[in-house]
């Protein structure tokens, strides 16, 4: 949907599986899902979250590419809230700066 950012606030596994690994995790890794090739172009570890720059290539549409920023806040506990909110608030602020005017833009929504 032409989204610029994905925000994930769960671990892949906590006692049991919470989320499937739907993308590669390391810089330079590629996965192919049907006609979409997903490549991690950059990984940046912030204090409380990780940001991955992902290039999505549509192999059926002249190899058209789209950049997506994946924010992963993995400190949210299974049945609790974070003890300290600074990391979560910093993440929200960074996403807001990256996607400042979604309502009046050609880009899709932030996916949470």
UniProtKB/Swiss-Prot annotation:
Under catalytic activity, the entry for this protein gives: O-phospho-L-tyrosyl-[protein] + H2O = L-tyrosyl-[protein] + phosphate
| Sequence ranges assigned to domain Tyrosine-protein phosphatase in this UniProt record | 1-112
**EC number(s) in its UniProt entry?**
3.1.3.48
By its UniProt entry, which Gene3D superfamilies does this protein fall under?
Protein tyrosine phosphatase superfamily
- Gene Ontology MF terms: protein kinase binding; protein tyrosine phosphatase activity
Q: Give GO terms for biological process.
A: signal transduction
- Domain of life the protein comes from: Eukaryota
Record-level GO cellular component terms: cell junction; cytosol; plasma membrane
Checking SUPFAM superfamilies in the record gives: (Phosphotyrosine protein) phosphatases II (SSF52799)
Key words of the record: Hydrolase, Protein phosphatase
Q: Name one Pfam family in it.
A: Y_phosphatase
Specify whether tRNA-binding is a keyword of the entry: no
- The first-level EC class reads hydrolase
- InterPro entries hit by this protein: Prot-tyrosine_phosphatase-like, PTP_cat, Tyr_Pase_KIM-con
Q: Which family does it belong to?
A: Belongs to the protein-tyrosine phosphatase family.
UniProt name for this protein: Tyrosine-protein phosphatase 8
Q: Which organism is it from?
A: Styela plicata
The gene behind this protein is STY-8
